[in-house]
Amino acid sequence: MSVIAPSFDMANILTELSSFLGALSLGCWVVLLIPQLLENYKNQSGESISDLFLIIWLIGDFFNVLGSIYGNVSSTVLVLSFYYIVSDSTLLMQIYYYRWKAARRIASREHEPLLQSRSLEEGLHAPIGKQQIWWDRLSTRQQFGVMGCVVIVSTIVGNLIISSASSDKSDDDLNAWPFTAGCISSVLYFCARIPQIIKNHKAKSTEGLSIIFFVLASVGNTSYAFSILVFPASDYLNYTYANLPWILGAFSTIFLDIYIFYQFIKYRNHY
């Protein structure tokens, strides 16, 4: 009696794995800023986030959009690239809104003797007062659980998006414009972390930063890089070279995120 061994199509398996990792990355990036937006709202301040961090990141988003346009990607992927710009801009505007609100509060009290001795700079960086929201009542483990569920849903949606865009994907074509835009955006994404690390070091604190924000960024970058690496391209070397800026950009930012995690541990008893 002969036993027929099951046949495995490794190319299909790797393609499905690549799609799953890409969807997981997409799921993380779609909800990435929600924890930090909630943290800022709770504190009524965004002074824990470096302006330069977000501005450089936003410029990187613009080059990412340029790469998407010149790369002839599907309209869905292009819309997601614009979504990243909108979400990052929202976080940046939230920070400046709280600064404007704090400046108005200081200006309205300038006639009070005690407040006359305070500088405007102190007023701008002072939180207006914490807001109690449902997110704040959850433990850190529960917050991770909630965001995990949201990421799962986003991953499922992301898988559908990637599946719809797969027919437009070229696995081994190198286009100069997307490659150049990818190089620039990867460098910007890497450099964006540096002002935040310096800010944390000077303040000797990570208070007001959401650790979930950086966890999602790390998972998103890791899964994104491996989604590229495991894809069974017909010309793997040329394919890898064409995607090298995004691979190096993803892995390099992970190392800086790890250092930020170290800062969370180092400064956790400072506040």
Curated annotation (Swiss-Prot):
The chain crosses the membrane at residues 17-37, 49-69, 77-97, 144-164, 178-198, 211-231, 245-265. Disruption phenotype: Increases vacuolar arginine levels and decreases vacuolar lysine and histidine levels. It is found in: Vacuole membrane. Belongs to the laat-1 family. The keyword Membrane applies. It catalyses: L-histidine(out) + L-arginine(in) = L-histidine(in) + L-arginine(out). Residues 14-80, 185-239 form the PQ-loop domain. GO terms for biological process: basic amino acid transmembrane export from vacuole; basic amino acid transport; vacuolar transmembrane transport. It holds the Pfam family PQ-loop. Keywords: Amino-acid transport, Membrane, Phosphoprotein, Repeat, Transmembrane, Transmembrane helix, Transport, Vacuole. It comes from Schizosaccharomyces pombe (strain 972 / ATCC 24843) (Fission yeast). The modification Phosphoserine is found at S119. Its main location: membrane. Gene3D superfamilies: 1.20.1280.290. GO terms for cellular component: fungal-type vacuole membrane; membrane. Amino acid transporter that moves basic amino acids across the vacuolar membrane. Appears to function as an arginine/histidine antiporter. Changing P195A: Impairs activity. One of its GO terms (molecular function) is basic amino acid transmembrane transporter activity. The gene is stm1. It is a multi-pass membrane protein. This is Vacuolar arginine/histidine antiporter stm1. It comes from the Eukaryota.
